[in-house]
Amino acid sequence: VDTGVVSGKLRIDSWDDGQDPVFHDEKRGRFITNMGFANFVTAAVDSDDERIKGSCMVILEEDDPGLYDRGTPTQKLVHQLSSTRDPAFNLKIPADRIIGGYTVKDGVIIPNYSHAEIIESVFRRTRVPVGIMSSAKLLSAPEPIIRYHRQRFRGGASTSPGTPRYDLGLQQKEDCLQRLVDIWAAGEAGSALGFLSARLFDDFDVIEKENERIFAEQGIKGRAQLKVFRKVQVDALEYLKMKTRPVAEQDAARLQELENDTLVQFLITDSLANVFCPAGKLWNTGHGATILREAVSLMGGYGITEDCPGFLGQKWMDAQLEATYEGPEAV
């Protein structure tokens, strides 16, 4: 997804009169998931040709002329079911592989979207399910823990059916119960936050498309959109202040007008998405991994075995990687 950190260069290989240009793409990837069997990839590239402006995302296919090297497998300790590699590409591709298309002005190819614009749009959505992944692991933990705790002392000569030691096992200990509740609550809270974010983006998708349509009709692009939103921000703040007032004090007509204003609703929903997406990703994966360690500890020695009930040890290790999915925590 980077253009400068890992090499990603795009130049024109040929451009005949009346024909679309053919590009020469050079790209090396790092820690690319599913690369072992992917027959196409999307790559971020920077212009290495004065006839191409800025950066863009392009589609590279296995059958394109040139080098499509999947690279060596990454020696991961976790998430073993996904193939991760460091690929290398040196390919010729048609110009229509630019994601989002392009225009030509004064002999210069201008991509409609930079690589950063596309990546931002993708990541702010894909970070949501990453957070839910960790929360799902937490929600799967209480059942095997309860089963282990209640069966812990069964089979012993001093433990007979019907006694608290037989029926409850380790759950006679208050500490075990409190820790278990913490694990369950963290899973429920993380899931609630994750699904709230998912529903928010469902609503945002509709508003975002309408927002893009309005700007396209008016021919407003780039920084000109920022100028428009500076004015819209005043209306958005007015809407938020009005929503906090008692119904009797609200101007119903004005409130309805602002609720029907696509740009106002876009600005508000976009602001919410900018908070809930990173918050869910950071808290669900970071705090989730910490709480999963608690789950492992409640399994005793079983917690670090390959056949641990619920595979909690493996899930805890997997959670360490999820904290870096779609950008590390520092990002």
Question: Over which residues does each language-model region extend?
Answer:
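A short core secondary-structure module
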Residues: G18-R70
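Flexible, small-/acidic-enriched active-site or ligand-binding loops
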Residues: G66-I98
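A glycine-rich, basic-preceded beta-loop-alpha segment at the flavin cofactor/substrate interface
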Residues: P87-T126, I146-Q171
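Terminal amphipathic helices with adjacent charged low-complexity linkers/tails
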Residues: R154-Q178, A185, V206-G222
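C-terminal helix-coil-helix/basic helical segment that borders enzyme active sites and/or dimer interfaces
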Residues: E188-K281
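Glycine-rich phosphate/cofactor-binding loops in nucleotide/flavin-utilizing enzymes
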Residues: T262-F266, I304-V331
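Charged, glycine-rich active-site and insertion segments that engage polyanionic ligands
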Residues: A273-Y302
